[in-house]
Amino acid sequence: MQLDTITKFLNTFFQVERYNEEEQGGIYLPSTRSIKRLGLALEPWDGLYNWVKSQHIDALFLHRPWKLDVEQLPPDIGVISYHLPFDESLTLGFNTRLADVLSLSNLEVFGEKQNRPIGMIGQAPNQSFTNICNCIKEVFNEYEQIRAASESEVKKVAVVGAMTDLLVREAASHGVN
């Protein structure tokens, strides 16, 4: 498999046409090497270059490649990078895969940045506040902050990548409990 085959798939998966050219991602460091082993990392770290060599990595997917020292990589290692498309598709925000895991339905866009959704509101199957907290902990392994709902049953949930006080109030005005 070649680097461009992987990026064609990821370009479609991440719907990169939604982003301006500088934010689309794709091939960060080109290569013609055939890819059998793809290394995945959020960003470069001190041991990355030895890891690439010891694991016989043919190409890297880096979420944040900016501190990558390409001179330390073995010759002809390709690098793929998707930052904003990754954040908006695979983390918090308008993430339909996450909505499926949380059993949310009737999704609505919640909040926008540069005409792109930064969050979602969805109907949750009626469940207790404790149950939804347990579900969130199971999916994410922890949560930064959570406050008890005024009602014992949770029916509507907001998921946002960068929740602010203003967005909390706006979510409440949309019936999020």
Predicted features, each with a name:
Residues 1-177:
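Hydrophobic structural segments
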